[in-house]
């Protein structure tokens, strides 16, 4: 998949929420410096993150923070924010427990904590 796009507002809010939860300082105006690279064919799903002038490549990463929410069909969705070995935003990873398509990203007020693996 070679498609890239701006980060959707719901994703921006979720990334900011997860970064804040981990006390990870995002650079000023970060949402305008990064591009989303969808990693799934679904409208809502995991995205790779890369700066405007870089190419998204697979590399070593680690989970910075995580949360969960319930989709409109009441199925749980886990969300993980990953950073690379340079402490740069790398992926926003979604996993719906029944592997069905994610329908909606709710506001961050709806997010719940989950134990980090």
Where are these regions (language model features)?
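Short, compact, well-ordered microdomains
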Residues: 71-116
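N-terminal domain-onset segments
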Residues: 1-66, 104-117
